[in-house]
Amino acid sequence: MNISLVDLTWACLMVSFTVSLALVVWARNGF
């Protein structure tokens, strides 16, 4: 299994974006 640095960086960006988006929605719902 060969994962390039670009793929790993992109995966981290997608995870960070998803988590931040979920936190925004969660905060808007009043926790």
From Swiss-Prot:
InterPro entries: Cytochr_b6-f_cplx_su8_sf (IPR036143), Cytochrome_b6-f_cplx_su8 (IPR005497)
Chloroplast found in the keyword field: yes
GO MF annotations, alphabetized: electron transporter, transferring electrons within cytochrome b6/f complex of photosystem II activity
Record bears the keyword Iron: no
Keywords: Chloroplast, Electron transport, Membrane, Photosynthesis, Plastid, Thylakoid, Transmembrane, Transmembrane helix, Transport
Predominant subcellular localization, coarse grouping: plastid
Membrane topology per record: Single-pass membrane protein
GO biological process, one term: cytochrome complex assembly
Cysteine pairings via disulfide bonds: none
Places the protein is found: Plastid, Chloroplast thylakoid membrane
Domain of life, per lineage: Eukaryota
GO cellular component, one term: cytochrome b6f complex
Transmembrane region(s): 5-25
Record's function text: Component of the cytochrome b6-f complex, which mediates electron transfer between photosystem II (PSII) and photosystem I (PSI), cyclic electron flow around PSI, and state transitions.
HAMAP family assigned: Cytb6_f_PetN
Subunit architecture: The 4 large subunits of the cytochrome b6-f complex are cytochrome b6, subunit IV (17 kDa polypeptide, PetD), cytochrome f and the Rieske protein, while the 4 small subunits are PetG, PetL, PetM and PetN. The complex functions as a dimer.
Similarity comment text for this entry: Belongs to the PetN family.
Name assigned to this protein: Cytochrome b6-f complex subunit 8
Source species of the chain: Cyanidium caldarium
